[in-house]
UniProtKB/Swiss-Prot annotation:
UniProt function note: Part of the ABC transporter complex CcmAB involved in the biogenesis of c-type cytochromes; once thought to export heme, this seems not to be the case, but its exact role is uncertain. Responsible for energy coupling to the transport system.
Topology relative to the membrane: Peripheral membrane protein
GO terms of molecular function: ABC-type heme transporter activity; ATP binding; ATP hydrolysis activity
Residues reported in the UniProt entry to bind ATP: 40-47
Cellular compartments annotated: Cell inner membrane
Pfam families linked: ABC_tran
This protein's name: Cytochrome c biogenesis ATP-binding export protein CcmA
PROSITE patterns: ABC_TRANSPORTER_2, CCMA
Keywords, ordered alphabetically: ATP-binding, Cell inner membrane, Cell membrane, Cytochrome c-type biogenesis, Membrane, Nucleotide-binding, Translocase, Transport
SMART domains assigned: AAA
Amino acid sequence: MQNAEAAPALLAAHGLVGRRGGRRPLDLNLRPGQLVHVRGANGSGKTSLLRTLAGLLRPRRGEVRWNGADIHADLPGYYLHMAHLGHDNGCSDALTARENLRYALHVAGAPRAEPELERALRDWGLAAGADAPAARLSQGQGRRLALARVMLSRKRLWLLDEPDAGLDAASLQRLHGMLDAHLAGGGAAVLASHRGGGAWAGCTQTLELDEYAHAEVVGADCLA
């Protein structure tokens, strides 16, 4: 992994104010190997921030840039490099777990060979029920399937909203390993979670949001 501080920013936000307003402008420069952990109570704006960084919401003020270019100038091009995981696992109940994984990766422009799909299903504990309708998956199983999709996408930037929701201890450990490998390979991530900052290995920054729309930055490597 290259030196994060010396590398140019992959994702940058300048003077960012969300649709609700009321928060001081946020500046962010996320470089290869860096992770920003966004914390805050329900309603503090974590999901809105991630959706704004993903290009799903337009900010009230400011801009989000990928490799120096405004993401809204070429959203399809941005999506070739970014994987977003929201609260919804994005699974079709009519498809099996295996079909969901195969189809989602194809749509994301990141198709994978069958052996890779099988290995991911096995590693995430989904192999036994891989050919059953996804409607039968528990919330935790659905989350693991969504994480397998993010991992196999190999996108440079991951935007993850509560990725640990519904995970057991073993799956949480696998998520940590997945993040470590992503960062070590030069990837970057913004992750929203209620868990303490120390829970995420490789976390270089913590952004604290509160219900009054205040933002407090802990550390100064990639947030200002």
